[in-house]
Every structure is written in structure tokens, then in C-alpha cells.
Amino acid sequence: MDRVRFKASGPPLRGWLLLATVTVGLLAQSVLGGVKKLDVPCGGRDCSGGCQCYPEKGARGQPGAVGPQGYNGPPGLQGFPGLQGRKGDKGERGVPGPTGPKGDVGARGVSGFPGADGIPGHPGQGGPRGRPGYDGCNGTRGDAGPQGPSGSGGFPGLPGPQGPKGQKGEPYALSKEDRDKYRGEPGEPGLVGYQGPPGRPGPIGQMGPMGAPGRPGPPGPPGPKGQPGNRGLGFYGQKGEKGDIGQPGPNGIPSDITLVGPTTSTIHPDLYKGEKGDEGEQGIPGVISKGEEGIMGFPGIRGFPGLDGEKGVVGQKGSRGLDGFQGPSGPRGPKGERGEQGPPGPSVYSPHPSLAKGARGDPGFQGAHGEPGSRGEPGEPGTAGPPGPSVGDEDSMRGLPGEMGPKGFSGEPGSPARYLGPPGADGRPGPQGVPGPAGPPGPDGFLFGLKGSEGRVGYPGPSGFPGTRGQKGWKGEAGDCQCGQVIGGLPGLPGPKGFPGVNGELGKKGDQGDPGLHGIPGFPGFKGAPGVAGAPGPKGIKGDSRTITTKGERGQPGIPGVHGMKGDDGVPGRDGLDGFPGLPGPPGDGIKGPPGDAGLPGVPGTKGFPGDIGPPGQGLPGPKGERGFPGDAGLPGPPGFPGPPGPPGTPGQRDCDTGVKRPIGGGQQVVVQPGCIEGPTGSPGQPGPPGPTGAKGVRGMPGFPGASGEQGLKGFPGDPGREGFPGPPGFMGPRGSKGTTGLPGPDGPPGPIGLPGPAGPPGDRGIPGEVLGAQPGTRGDAGLPGQPGLKGLPGETGAPGFRGSQGMPGMPGLKGQPGFPGPSGQPGQSGPPGQHGFPGTPGREGPLGQPGSPGLGGLPGDRGEPGDPGVPGPVGMKGLSGDRGDAGMSGERGHPGSPGFKGMAGMPGIPGQKGDRGSPGMDGFQGMLGLKGRQGFPGTKGEAGFFGVPGLKGLPGEPGVKGNRGDRGPPGPPPLILPGMKDIKGEKGDEGPMGLKGYLGLKGIQGMPGVPGVSGFPGLPGRPGFIKGVKGDIGVPGTPGLPGFPGVSGPPGITGFPGFTGSRGEKGTPGVAGVFGETGPTGDFGDIGDTVDLPGSPGLKGERGITGIPGLKGFFGEKGAAGDIGFPGITGMAGAQGSPGLKGQTGFPGLTGLQGPQGEPGRIGIPGDKGDFGWPGVPGLPGFPGIRGISGLHGLPGTKGFPGSPGVDAHGDPGFPGPTGDRGDRGEANTLPGPVGVPGQKGERGTPGERGPAGSPGLQGFPGISPPSNISGSPGDVGAPGIFGLQGYQGPPGPPGPNALPGIKGDEGSSGAAGFPGQKGWVGDPGPQGQPGVLGLPGEKGPKGEQGFMGNTGPSGAVGDRGPKGPKGDQGFPGAPGSMGSPGIPGIPQKIAVQPGTLGPQGRRGLPGALGEIGPQGPPGDPGFRGAPGKAGPQGRGGVSAVPGFRGDQGPMGHQGPVGQEGEPGRPGSPGLPGMPGRSVSIGYLLVKHSQTDQEPMCPVGMNKLWSGYSLLYFEGQEKAHNQDLGLAGSCLARFSTMPFLYCNPGDVCYYASRNDKSYWLSTTAPLPMMPVAEEEIKPYISRCSVCEAPAVAIAVHSQDTSIPHCPAGWRSLWIGYSFLMHTAAGDEGGGQSLVSPGSCLEDFRATPFIECNGGRGTCHYFANKYSFWLTTIPEQNFQSTPSADTLKAGLIRTHISRCQVCMKNL
């Protein structure tokens, strides 16, 4: 309570002083009661009666001896949370979050560097796409790309066991800012520590509180008038010299005042004090209140005497003050008379320490023996001191103790005090009391007393009387008990020293105490014992009369004497006793001192409760610790997954007859004597404790198959497999049933007499034929299932099905074979001893036992071999250097981590060496229609390329336009009928000449299909169609034969049955190249031949035929009208070639027939002559999208292009809309591609087809390197034949597209692959009945007449046998499209399973199919090879002037081409691209390239490498940094050392690796090491560099944006990167890069792009004090916004780093 102050507010309160005294005394009791037990109501007090009075506590005794060390207490309760600290610094990178969802497809990367300029070719118009070339050789393996950025850390592992304490780290003094940055959060209160060993005796404690007031001394004589003193305590005297630093004072009582700081929290007095917290921020001014009185410091030097103050009001007696210095004795005053014994004065409570010295206390306990001090000399008498310091108000004088007042009344219970009240006014001085009893022991004195003045020899004083026992105090009233629910608090702080107790009974005289320690000189004591005889004093004042006078009145108290002068320092006193521990002091603010020596080891504490798992620390991983002791056995883990069954063990064998146990199972075995009999098996032991997880076992043998489980649910259908190759041809099917009698046919012209054929057996009756007007029947039943086909190619793996439902448990499997012996279990507890059994006979060798159940894990085994290196952990903050640990055990392989986030686009790699020619890339997307180019120069004809892979099957074409009807021929002469002619079928006659064009006749009745006619010669090439034909079957690819002679179009023959497979023809010789001819006019279409709807098997691959000569130009013939009815003849011999018939009359238009079957493919014509150059055509239709390319490699990011020149709006002339054909049938699926024919003659311009819908885009091809150029390349060589393409899937037919604009005439395309025969079309409607013919006599063979009108259907003849294979007929012209007929009647399916026939011969090339609708784009096929070069197009118009590209690499030397014809002079071309940088006289610029990997970088194209080395960033010597410009050659040291320099002093002495100097190097992307790396381990972390000789200076340009900046005009790019500005490391030293230097543009971005190497230690490491500074992205509004603070985590950093490009001037 002596720390509570009251300040009287003025005179009105003085009257309440007595009441305040009592009240405060009671309050003190209630307050002090706060430390009592409060966990029961009323703190355990009996509140039923009145308040019990507790006697006042006596003075504190001497400290007892140090007790024995106590036991470890239990862990303390968790303390209350400490105050909220200031906001911490930015934390390190957090633990990676869970893998996010897959991000959207990122933006397309920047374009790669432009390649080197090629040698300009002759400008020519691009030919059509050539055939694909063969695959090129695989390229050489490129240089390794730059190391990717470090992957994000894995998920935090489980906390490992507590490692041993690491070695003490190196001290590092942080600056104040760094201390603030790295200051940790206040820790939790620690556990109670062990009792330490007794410490050394501490320094003498501070002066204790004052004792009770002693009796007042006799008044001294008035001293001489002092010099004017300061006015009371209110004014300050002259500043004294700085005193010695006092010891820290004890802590004040905790206050309940809430201090409002930056963070608002209430300070509770009962909280444990935590460790020293961080330095708080500047608080706002607190509540103004007077603080506690500090402990009096060491005395200052003596001040000047103050002026006399006015007499103050008599103040209340203050508490005893600190003893002042020993003043000199004043002049002796007149002797007073002895006063009467006064009554004992009352105990006075004063809130202030008393200044009066108490009476001598009881002897203290035996103190420790100190060194005997030297005896001091008697001091001189001092002069009278100045008035002592007043206590309380300025003008009050110190009063004497008052008498004990009467007992006051009980006051009202006061409300609990929240704040300290003001001090009360000083009371008036009471009358002097009698000497009090002995006070409590005085405080320990200071170590060094002040030397007193030499004193005068005093007289012996009388012995004091024993004091009487004090009177008993009054019993107080019972206190109010507040019996509310009281929560037990923590132990309170030690209470203040209590008031002095009432005088007790006189004790016995104590033993002589040891001499006390020297204390600070006190006030003058009572008269001492007789001293040593002093020197004679001066003559005294005349004494009183010897006569007895009346007793004088007690004199007034004398004025306090003037302060004496400061005496000399006294002899050091003995050490005082240890004081009690002080209250915790306030947090100090000194700088953290160096670590002290290690203390003695404490007693091991009890195991604390496990703390919560803390968050992962942020230090760098510490070194690998020593191997720890085996940990306690953990709780049993969950049962592991059953391992695979082991292989059967070898059977054990017990040989009791030999006395030896064979080591079958391995290990040392005991000897069994002959006649041994094993005892019965003991009961199983108790399970042993589980062992640690064993190492991963070797893979066991596969177990036996278990019982089949229930069938799972059907999975989702897989992707359709590729179509298989055609099966072998089936057996010939049975002959069809005989048809019904048909309508009579028209009499044909008599044929030549045929050779007699063998008589065929009569055929069965056929199915009724079609009757005019009959409706088609319903669809027949489905046929029987065919034989299983051959196994198809495996389909693509389907998507995984859903997980099936849990199957029913299977039946118990068969008993498995015994497995390997299980691991040894823990030894079981001993079972009870069995009874002694009889000895058994030796057993036979038993069968192999079943495997034992796996034993529980054993105890920790011996130390294993070092495990595999673990996965590198995330980079933490630097940890303290730990003890070097043993290698830990190998951990089990973890589960694969979740997929990481999609990384940012990596930095472009270093340009590798030019690789070998790679495989051709896939076609890119169809580009937009370009502008019409200028006419180019004719290119030189390229060499013949290889044949390409056949393309995919085309989509069905639309039906062609019906041709005009041909002329009617003249009637032939009657045939000469010879005997036997009607019995013999004649052979087919020769082909007649082409008839004249007839008029259009009426459409005849649909006749029955005739027997197959002889194939005609191939017709001339038709005009190229714009629309794809019907997708034909894929034949076996043959090598393309040379085109045959063109035949004239014969009349349509009847399609024969499929022929047998022909043998492969011989390979023809290639024809000579024709001269350039003019484009011939388009030939007429021939008649379309009928086909029998039996599809032929795919033919074998034929050899390449001889090149045919160009066919004659045919007339545009049509189907002739029916001739006059000839005499009926039998089939005659082949007649001579007839002359052309007369032109027939025009017939009526026939009915539209159904779409006929697809004709056989025609032969491939020879290439026509090259036409003259035409004028530029109108723009062509957009091509179909190309097939999907394989994924290209990621190109280097390109530079941002310049804005292109504005294009010319040029639309072609609108074309005529083409007719919309009927929708064709869906073609059969292609199996193998046919051979590519030679190009046909150039056809006339076809009518444009309808525009198909846009196909789905193919996959993205390789990004092309497209330097702008307006010069077309020359046509390439003809490629070699391609390999067979795989069959694509059939795409569904698409809807008809809108009418397209007319396209320009395209270049002549290559002939398409030969198609298979189409499917049989529907039977057309029957034509009108013809006139009946008369039977004629057999005539001689006349000339072949034109085909007559269809006659009536004749009676059905017998079905003839299959005739021999006829000769190949001519190719017919495309027929007119028929109208859709009504469906035919369904055939009766034969119920026989037909074997597939053998592979038939390759059919002839069919006619162009009808125009089908454009189907949707099928799935992308495999990439094709390079096509043959197209013809040179006409010269294009001059292109727009292009931006100069960059210089590319020089291509390889081309082959010598043939001498081309002289082309027409072209228009002047645009300026060419800049050439290679030439060697100049002034060459000698240096360029440094840093790879930021451990691979040497390549110099840019055209530059020589001068040397390569290691990328030096800067040095640090004598704590100063010396920076290197990364763009200059000095940053590329040829050799690496952690200490590449030494230092020399002026004394001609140099030192190497003797200081803490450092070197800093650009680093690689190698994973951050846990510990500093040394020697060879350093190499993967140091970036390599090359110094190149450049023809011009290189500069860096920075975009201050995320986009790549452009090089200035006339400069080319060398590399792109990130804008590196500066760096700092140890000691806040560092450097920076000039932003114009290439060193400021690093190709790769890292948060820490360099590593620190310590020269003295020879190690390198990434320490936490490295900072890199980069230019950031700045929005365009430069002055319109204030930068906003932001923290970027990993993954977002590159979005705020400026990009840059290093450019070199083109010379």
C-alpha cells in the first residue's frame, strides 16, 4: 500500500484526514485481502459473524537459508493471451494452396524469333499443294531448354519427430529496422523452469523501506542562516552532476487503467508477463496521472543553499524518507531539561515514507561473513545542514508523531477504487511522542558508503529503558463480506510492506549481532556509547547556573540543519544479503547482447503436455540432423493393405536321426539330438508391440487368380476403332432365283455369229420382274448373321467407365498355396509352462505349412542404410545451424502430388544449334482469302517429288448436269443369218467410230440390266468438278500407271460381273515431259455406262502403266435415239467398223432417272501440255480446313508486330450460281487409298459449286515463322510416293451450303485416287413400251448401228452361265443425273452365310460421281506429305511493301535446277530484306549472354564466341560492394571461385580468403539447397555465360508493360526477357544495372536471381537477405494515380514485371 498515493485537493479535505486515515487503513485490509483464497465463497472466510480482525503483520524477517531444490511443478495453466502485437512484417511465401481447377487455355504465346532470311527465290505464283514427302530424319537432340521455374511446394508433410537442438547460430546484429522486420511474435508464457543452482551473491540491494519513526532527537541549536534555498520542491535547483545509474526500481502495482494504444486491449493486472515483446508503435498520449514514486537515486552533488521559504502549513507527518548524508555536527546547543515521559503515541499511517530514523532494530540474523572493512577515521564535525526537504505540500514542515487518536467509527464501505486517489493534505504536526519501540530492520546499505566528516568525540549516552508492551488495539467492526461468485485468480503479486505493527512485548535481549554492513550515513543517531577520547574541543558556551531552577518548557523543534557537504567515499561495505526477487521490471529497450555462455544443465523437467502443432516455420531447412534415438513405440497404425502373397517357402526339414537341424529356413538352427521328440506347441504369446513401418518389400510373386467376380456394369462405349482392312473375298454366292418373264425387249441389231458356247443348265425361275406401275414391296427381313469377321484393329481406349456397383462377394476361392513366411512377430509373452509330454517319435517331413498371419511390427531395428534422397522441400528461412545429423532412414515413397497449377509460360530458351531437318509439320488452318497478288515470274520447274499418301475419301459429289441427247443413227442392214448362228453366242464386236450427234430422243423404258459389257478405253479427262464426288471405297493403293491411249467413247455396255483378281502389271517406264502446249478446249462428255450392281473386290495394286498419248477431242455426244428396228439376228461375229450414222431427230426429254451407280474409275491420263499464262483469276473459294496438325512445339515469344499496311478491298466478279444437284447416297467407307494419278489436262472453267459449311478447325499446327515477303518461292521438287494413309472415319453428311461466289479458276489439281465401284442404284421406272420387232434372218455382220430405242420387254430367257471376262471397255462420259426412282421391290435374302471373296483386281477408274452435298469436316487424318509442285501461276500484282524481317540463318545449298525458260519481265519488286551483318573494319563490340542455367549459352547468329565463363554479379569486400554490369564482358569470368580476389594492405602483405568477403553470381533454376553447398555441389547453381563478338552495339529496350517491346526500326532482336534493375544482399550492399545495358534484360525471371558465395568458407547459399529489384508494369496514365501497395504471391509476380528486348542494329 505504500505505493498508493493520495493527493489532497486542498484545505477542505484536511478535516477529513483522520477519517481518511482509518478508511484507507480498512481499505488496505480489503485490498490486501485480495490475495486470499477466492475459490470458495468469501475466500474461505466465515462470513456468518462479524468481521474478524487480523492482527497486523509484523516486519519481514531476514531471508532464510536457501531451501533444497523443489520438484518440478506441473505445467502451469495456459496464460492469457498477450497483448496484440503490432502488425508483423510481410510473411514469407505461404504454403501452396490446394491445386485449383484447370485454368482456361492461356493466350497464344508470343511469336518466335524470325528465322534467317532465305536467298530470294524467283517470284512465282504458288502452285497447288504438293504431295507430302517422306518423313525426314529425326533431328539431333536440341540443347536442353532453360530450367523451368521451381515447382510449387508439395503439401506440408506431417510434423517429423523433434530433432535435437541445433548448433548455436552465428550472431548477427540487425539494424533497428531489421529487428522490427524480423521480430517474432511474443511467445507464449514458458513453463515453470527448474530451480536453478544458487547464484553468486548479487550486488547489494537497494535501500529497503523505512522503519517506523524513531523518537525525535533533541532539538539541535539553530544553525546559521543558510544561503537562500530553492523554493520547496516545486522548483528545481541547479542541475547536479550526473549521478551513477541507479539499480532498476521494483515494478509498480499493476494498474487497471486501460491504456489506449494502436491496438485497443485492456491490460489486466493479473496476467503473467510474457517475454519481451516487439517495440510497440508510438502510442497516443495516455491519461495524465502521477506515476509512482521512484526509488531514490544515488545522491547528487550538493546544491547551493536555497532561500528561506515561507513557513508552510503544518503538514501531516510523512513517511520516513531515505536517509540523507551524514551532516556535520552543529554547534552544541544549550542543554535542555529532560522532558517527562509522554504517553505512547498512536500508530500513524502515512502514505509517504517517514524521514525520521527509527530506533535500533533487533539484531539481525547471522549474515554472511564479509571481508572486514578498514576502519574509517573519525570525521570532522560537519557544519549545520540546510533545511531538509519538505514532504507533501511546498510550505509544510515535517511534524512530529501525533498521539494515538481514539478509535474512529466504521466508515461506509467504500466503492472499490478504480484509480489512485489524490494524496491527502498534510496534517498538522502532533506533539512529540516518546521514543517508539525498535523499528523493523533497516534496509541493506549500499556497497560504498560515503565518507563522513571527522566527528567529534561524543559523551557516553545512557542506556535506554526497555520499552513497554504496546497496548492492544481495538477490535474492529466486522467487514462487509461480498459473497458473490468469485473466480479464483492467479496468485497475486507480492503485496506491499504492511504498516508497522503495534509495539510488542519486550523481547529478550538478543545475542550480539555481527557487525552490519555499512549503510548510507543516516541522520544523527541518539547519543552513542562513549567514544574514544577525542581531541580537546573548543571552549564551550557558558553553562547554566548550578542552582536548581524550575524545569524549563520543552523547546520547539529546531530548524533542520543545512545539508552537509558531500563526504569522501567510504570504504566498501560487506555484501548484503540477497534481497527478495523484485517485481518484473518493464521491458528494457537495450540492444540484445551477445549470447551468454551456456548455463549449467538444469534438472530434466517432466514431460510437458504436447503442444498444438505449430504452423510450418519459415526458415530455410536446417542441415540434416544426427540420427535420433529410436522413438517410443507409437500406437498401432491402421492395418495396412494386404501385400501380395509371397512365394511358397522351402519346406522345413527336421532330421532327428542325424542330430542336426538343416539350415533350410536360413539362420543358425539348434541341434536336435537323435530320437528327439518335440513337445506340444505352447499357447500363443501375447501380441508384441507393433513395430515401426518396415521398408517397402520387394514385389511379391503374383497370386493365383481369384474366383471370378460378378460381371460389372457395362461400361460406356469406347471410341470407334479404326476400320479394319478388307477381309478376304468370300465364296461366290449361289445363283439367284430365276426372274419372272420380263417385258419383251426391242429387237436388237443382229450380232455377229458367236462361237457355240456350252449348254448351260436351265436356271431356276426368277423373281417376278418389275411391272410398270407396280409399287415396291416392303423391306425384307434381316439376313442371317454372317460369319464373324476378322479381328479388327484395336479401338482407341474408351473413356473410363463409371465405377461399377459393388459386386456380390464371390465364392470363397480355392485354398491358396502357402505364402512366404510372414515377418517375425514380436516375441510373445511366455505362456504357462506346459505339462511334460512324452517323447514323440520323430515325425516325417511335413507338407509345407500355410503362411502364418503377419506378426505385428517389431521394435525399431538397427540403424539402416542411408535412404534415398528425399524430395527437396520448399525453401524456408535460414535456420540455425544444426548439429550435423546422421543420415535419416529412407522414407516411403509418397503418393503423387496433386497436379500443380498451370505454370506461366516459360522463358524462351536459348536458341539451340540448328537441328537437322525435322518431319514435315501438319497443315495449319485455312487462312483467310488473301489479296490478289501481283503476277509473279514463272518459277523453274521443280524436280519430281515422291508420291504422297493418298488423301482421305472425298465426300459424295452432287449429281452432274444431264447432257444433251445424241443423234440418231441410221438403220443398219439386215443381218446375214447363217445356220447355227442362233445357237452360238457371238463375241463382242469391235468398237465402232463415234457417231454424229443425235437429237434428244424420248427416254426409253427402263430396261433390265444387260450382261456386263466390255470395258471401254478411258475417256478424255473431264472438266474438274468443284464439288467432291461420292466417297468411294478405298482400294489397295497401286502405284499409279501411266495414262493409256485415250479411246473414243463407246456406247454404254452392260456392266459385267466382277472379274477375278488380275495379276499385277509390270511397272511402266516414265514418259517424257511434254512441251508446253496451249490449253485445249474441253472435250465432250461420253455416255454413261450401265453397271451391274455387284461391287467388285478391291483390286490388287497395279504397276505403273505406260504413259498414254493424249486422246482425241471427243464430240459432245449424247445418247442416240433408237435406230430403226433391225432384223432380228443372233449375235454375230465382230463386224467391221461402221461409218458414222446420220443425225437423228431430237427426242422428247426423258424422265429423270435415279442417281446411277458410281462408274468405274477411268484411267489416268497423261499430263497435258502446259498452258499459256492466264490472267489472274478471281479469288477461289475457301478451301476445306486442313487436317489436324500435330501439336507444335512452343515457339519462342515473338515480338510485337508493327501495324500492317491497309489491305486493298478487291472482290472478284460475282459468278453464276451453280445448279443444286440431288443429294447423293452416302458412299461406302474407304479402306485403303488408291494411287494418285498423273495430272489430267487442264479443263475448262467449271461452274462453281455450292459453298459447304465451314469445317471444324483442325488442331493448331506449328506456329510458322513468317517473315513478311512478297516474293513467292519456286516450286519444290516432286515428292516421292507417299505411304498409305490410315483410313479416316466417315463423317456424317452435312447440310447443303449456301451458294458460293464464283471462284477463280484453280490450278490443275492432281487426279484423285481411283474409287471402287459404287453401290447399285435403284431400279429406274420402266420406260414406255417399244414397238415389237420382226424376226429377221441372220444377216452378215453389218456395221454397228447406234443404239435403238428400248423395245418392249421380251420374254425372260434362261439365265446364262457366267461368260468369260471381256476386254476392258472404253471409259464412258459422265451420264446425266437421273431423277429419283421409286424404290425397287425388296430382294429375298438368301439365308446362306457367304464367305468373303478374295480380294478382287483393282477396278477401272470410275466416272466422276454426282455432286453430293458437302459433308461436315471429318476428324483430322494423319499429316500428309509434301505434295507435288504446282504449275507456275501468272505473275501476281506487286505486293504491299513489307516490314523488314530479321536476318535468318543461311539455308543449305540447293541442287542445281534445270535452266528455266526466260520469264516475262516482272514488275519491280519491293525492297528486299536486310542482309547479313557484314564484317566491318570497326567490329569489336562485345555482347555478353547469360544463360541462367548451367549450360553455356550460344552466341546469336553471325557472332563469334570469344570465351565462355561464369556469370559474376558483384563482389563484396570490406563490407563494400563492387557491382558488375551484366551486359559487359567483365561479368563473365572464365573461371569460378567463391573467392576470386585477395586484398593487400600497405605493408606489402596480402591476404586471401581471410575475411568474410563474398562474391555474388547469377544463379540457375536448380532447387534451393537446404544448407550451404560446397565444392562440386556449387556447380549446378552458377549460371554460365558467353562473350560474343558483335558487329554492332546492343541495347535493351523496356516496355514497362507485360508485352514485349519493339526494337527500333532498323534493329533486330537478340533475345527477350525481364527488366532487372538492381539487387541488394548482405549489409544492405548491392548494385544495379544500367537500363540500356543488355544486362538489365534477363531472359528468365526469378525472385532471387543470384546466389551468395562466402569466400572464407568456400560455400554458397541463398540467404534471406537477398533482394532483387525489377522494373514493374506501369499503366499509361502516368500522373493520374497514386501507387497502391500490393503484395504479389507466386504465380502473379510475372504479371507485374516489365518485359524487355535486347536489340542490335542491322548493318
Curated annotation (Swiss-Prot):
**Compositional bias per record (Basic and acidic residues), positions renumbered to this chain:** 175-186, 270-279, 565-577
| Keywords tagged on the record | Angiogenesis, Basement membrane, Bromination, Collagen, Disulfide bond, Extracellular matrix, Glycoprotein, Hydroxylation, Repeat, Secreted, Signal
SMART domains tied to this protein: C4
Q: What does this protein do?
A: Type IV collagen is the major structural component of glomerular basement membranes (GBM), forming a 'chicken-wire' meshwork together with laminins, proteoglycans and entactin/nidogen.
Its gene name is Col4a2
Q: Where is this region: Disordered?
A: 60-253, 266-476, 524-900, 1195-1476
Q: What is its main location?
A: secreted
Disulphide connectivity of cysteines? C1499-C1588, C1532-C1585, C1544-C1550, C1607-C1703, C1641-C1700, C1653-C1660
Biological process, per Gene Ontology: angiogenesis; cellular response to transforming growth factor beta stimulus; collagen-activated tyrosine kinase receptor signaling pathway; DNA-templated transcription; endodermal cell differentiation; negative regulation of angiogenesis; response to activity
**Annotated Pro residues bias:** 215-225, 432-443, 636-650, 746-761
**Compositionally biased tracts (Gly residues):** 121-130, 148-157, 852-861
Q: Does the keyword Thylakoid apply?
A: no
Q: What is this protein called?
A: Collagen alpha-2(IV) chain
Q: What species is this protein from?
A: Mus musculus (Mouse)
Domain comment from the record reads as follows: Alpha chains of type IV collagen have a non-collagenous domain (NC1) at their C-terminus, frequent interruptions of the G-X-Y repeats in the long central triple-helical domain (which may cause flexibility in the triple helix), and a short N-terminal triple-helical 7S domain.
Signal peptide range? 1-25
